[in-house]
Amino acid sequence: MTAEEYAAAQAAITAGLATYVQRFASLFVGPALAVGEWLRLLQVLFPEIQRRYADAAALGRDFYDSQRALHHPELPRNERFRGELRWEWFVQNMEPARKEMSQADSPPSATSKLALAAVREVEMAARRQIIGAVKNDPAPQIVQGWARVATGRETCAWCLMLISRGAELNHKGNFAYSSAEAAGLNLDDETVIDLWNESGHDLEKFREETREDFEKWHAGCDCLVVPVFDVQNWPGRDAALRAQQLWIEASDEADDLIASGKARSKNKNTETLNALRRRLARGEITMSNYALAA
């Protein structure tokens, strides 16, 4: 399976999900939504989201297997269970969307936020599957880490920053992340429990696994996770190098603004991100140039 096939398959899994969620959510808009009614809405949505989550997890597993076999055909398959979405985790992860949905005469954005949260949950399945496989490969010496790559469809300045900063953040001087600090691992209840179970309930091991992880997969983000077995040859590396150059240029602009006193703050990271956003707003950046298939 190529990275382009992986991206297309992921898009196919989530296609139509937002419309599906909004169609049912619109039936619950109007009167103030009590907790019981909110849970009934989630019960209606859960089977379809759970089905698509399983499909996305299987896709992530297949892509990891294909990349591993491409680089190391002599090794047996990394047997790893496919991730599953549990009801209690789903309820927890949809909680941010409940506030607006619970208001009387909910604004139109309420159903959109719920739809984006549902799509994000499905997209997290493949990410979690691949990151988990990287962290627990039985032949750890063969895997360098994982990388975050853009599709170019929904990539924002924040995502572009995370993609571009890999080389300066990774001690190996490449874009493969053995931890999630730079590329962004979502630590919702499901991921935490997965990592806790995989640590064998060893508290010290669990702390080591999660100490650098931050929630950086925002709703609406369609960035993909790819495993890295060869730091000089992995899907999306060329685009990541181009993104890194973009970050360097934005960093230079931030330095100039800070030095001149024209910057809003003296925080270089913040000002670099702002510079990147301004370039996006002015139409100077074509996002597809920094995407996986660019």
Swiss-Prot record:
Query: Organism's domain of life?
Result: Viruses
Family annotation (Pfam families): VG15
Q: What is this protein called?
A: Gene 15 protein
* Naturally occurring in which organism (per UniProt): Mycobacterium phage L5 (Mycobacteriophage L5)
Lineage of the organism: Viruses, Duplodnaviria, Heunggongvirae, Uroviricota, Caudoviricetes
